[in-house]
Amino acid sequence: MEKPVVISQRTGKPKRRKAHRACIHCQRTHLTCDNNRPCERCVARGFADTCVDGVRKKLKYLDDKEDNKPSKGLSPAPGVNVQPKLSPATRSARSSSAGFPDTKGNMQQQHMGNMPVPNTPQNGHPNLGTPGMAHTNLQGPQRQGAQQPQGGQSSTPSQLPADYLIHQQLLATEINQLGDLGRTGEGDFSSDWFSDLQLSGHSFQSVATNMEYSILSNMVYSSGQPNSAVSNSLLLGNNSQSPNTHSPHNQDQPTPQAATPSAKIKQLIESNGLSAKDLNQYPLAGEFVNDTFLTVPEIVAFNETRRNVKDSELTTDEKLRPLSFAVAAGQPQNTNGNGNGSEAPDSPSKSIFSSGALEAVYSNLPDYTDPIQVYTNITKPFSYTPGYHGLISYLKGRFNKQQLVQMTKYMAEYRPSFIACTNSLKEEDLVFMEQCFQRALLEYQKFISFSGTPTLVWRRTGQLAAVGKEFCQLSGWSEQRLIGQQTFIVELLDDNSVLEYFELFSRIAFGDSRGATMADCTLLTPTGAKIKTSSIWTLKRDVFGNPMMIVGNFLPILS
């Protein structure tokens, strides 16, 4: 139904009706159009053949598609990539296909997906490559020339992430800090540990995260390489010779760098007067491991027969037996050159490692018995970095590359988050965290003494903090051996249980605080025998939401 014609009072002529949509010519000249096609103005002007509806501008809030074209009149400069605006869904899809980190899952895929087929530069160390990223080493001209950019393009600082350029400064700072720890008696890490790191061009927004993934990558790819500075510096400290330098037989023995991993382990064990039965957790020396399972009555009976034995009556092998080869900082014992285990008063103290290599990890912590002691004596934060590096050293000495890849995958899910959560904390916050840990440990020790259940308490790095006497009766380990030498929980587990440990911990570190259950957890005794158990973990967090301690209960499976 058409509207009635309205007569204008000023002109006395019918008013021109507003058109629903102007034609293209009237739209350009901003003139009033009508609904006829061709309109009256186009007929008068001779544009009747081209009079069509004009195109309206779509409102921005109604536009579903972003304008991906650059502005009119602007052209990008040569060599500058113009990135179009993308929706969140498109951006996520493109980042996933290109291999760039977008979420935690993509970061995992980026670093773990290419591990089985790494790129090997001239220096012999495979690097964890990332699609679309240039790999650059800061280790000198020789390594920088290992990979050349394609197409004749030169690598300029503008093509690298901003935080990647300060990696070398970060490494120097951390080395200096670790050197200060050694001067204060807390530890002495060799700078060679960091000299062989393969720093890949990761583009995370955190320097600490980039550093962490470089350490994890190097942990996997330097495993089993005799010339790896990382493994040599952590296993042998700052010394380039065998620890048993006073033995005349060392002149005829091959150096550890020239031997295979298995031969190197046996050589160092024999040079320290240890017997074959002391190797209780090594897949590389599987002939030393007893595959039989002990029952709880046998272990209890064995412990009862040795309850009243004094330390002076123990044999030399029992005194020297380390918990494991790779992390036994070792009680300083004297042996003569023939390695028979007898004491030599004139020779200096020796251990499997150099005296200061992992001292920060295995220094005996004070035993607090009262809350006042906790709040009064704890004035410095607890350093988790030496413990983490000690754990990596142990894993590299025990497991093969395929197992290390699986463990690194799980570590990559929680380790960078630990660093990110603690970066914003002040020193007073870290001191308070340690006070909370020790205060909570006091209460748990009371509860463990009353519960009667085999129980262990360890930190998020895996270092044992408390052990119940029931666990000692179950496993055969003494409390002095487990707590006095700052043992890792993974040392008490067999290979499959260690892999399951890292998988469960990555799931509960920032997930369900109620803990997890390991239906089949196999413990290792001092003699290398295995005990099947079922364990339950309870995770306790600090006031900042970080995992503080894990309480594990172990019950034997007798069937």
UniProtKB/Swiss-Prot annotation:
DNA-binding region: 23-51
UniProt cross-references to Pfam families, sorted A to Z: PAS_13, Zn_clus
Alphabetical GO biological process terms: cellular response to starvation; gluconeogenesis
Residue ranges, annotated region (Disordered): 63-159, 231-263, 329-349
Keyword Cytoplasm: no
Comp. bias regions, Low complexity: 139-159, 231-244
GO cellular component: nucleus
CDD domains: GAL4 (cd00067), PAS (cd00130)
PROSITE patterns documented for this protein: ZN2_CY6_FUNGAL_2 (PS50048)
GO terms for MF: DNA-binding transcription factor activity; DNA-binding transcription factor activity, RNA polymerase II-specific; RNA polymerase II transcription regulatory region sequence-specific DNA binding; zinc ion binding
Keyword check for Zinc: yes
Record-annotated PAS domain positions: 440-512
Role of this protein: Transcription factor which regulates nonfermentable carbon utilization. Activator of gluconeogenetic genes.
Name under which the protein is recorded: Transcription activator of gluconeogenesis ERT1-2
Species assigned in the record: Yarrowia lipolytica (strain CLIB 122 / E 150)
Lineage: Eukaryota, Fungi, Dikarya, Ascomycota, Saccharomycotina
